[in-house]
């Protein structure tokens, strides 16, 4: 048994699970990276730790300072986890409609939360975070939606872990996009290793990648109101726009068939991965990402179709 000295040592190297109980063509394999196994419960633990270390190493914030961010919750949890380790305070701007559980976890880790109006979306939270940086001495707004550390984190960690786990035998990569960092970084790594890897980006109805108008959706953690600078169309070969109904249906099926407790963004990714599997030939390996678990969305009635 491994002995560790800080919980952040457990970030990364999460399991890759082959899904066995969904109906896919013979010889086609669907794998899921179980990012809820990170210590803070989501894929954003990777990013939070990298952002904190970058901020300190580059002098953007000094010891004892304040980290500020606009977040739906998971990035905030990851940042709070590592801010605690390095003696930094954390303030997060969160749009009103996001999961109560995630906000409670951020506060349990010592963070302060400022709510912004639901109708202002994530852009409203970003503007508030930028304002706070100008008002608070020795503070740094990490701005995950613009920060190149975001895609770099997953280029350096998630992509290589997947590649190594399957000895490079990856044919299709499927993942949702919220800030876009996970997708852009991982897809870039996989395309560099093998340009033939098909990269499939997943968004909810109400996101803009397929040319739709941005509007509210129940699927939490993915969906873009704007496209960040570090993402372009070379990162993805296909877009799946998934309804809330299909995302939440797959959340329930994952629990019933695989014993997996996944969030709605994972449900959307799973829906797209299974659709890709229907078209795939024998010998195809499809890899997707489950960013977090359902336990932080119980108040949002995740198993009743969401609110």
From Swiss-Prot:
Binding residues for pyridoxal 5'-phosphate: 74, 178-182, 265
PROSITE patterns, per the entry: CYS_SYNTHASE
GO biological process: cysteine biosynthetic process; cysteine biosynthetic process from serine; positive regulation of cell population proliferation
Protein name (database record): O-acetylserine dependent cystathionine beta-synthase
Phenotype on disruption: Grows very slowly with methionine as sole sulfur source.
PANTHER family for this protein: CYSTATHIONINE BETA-SYNTHASE (PTHR10314)
Organism: Bacillus subtilis (strain 168)
Gene Ontology CC, one term: cytoplasm
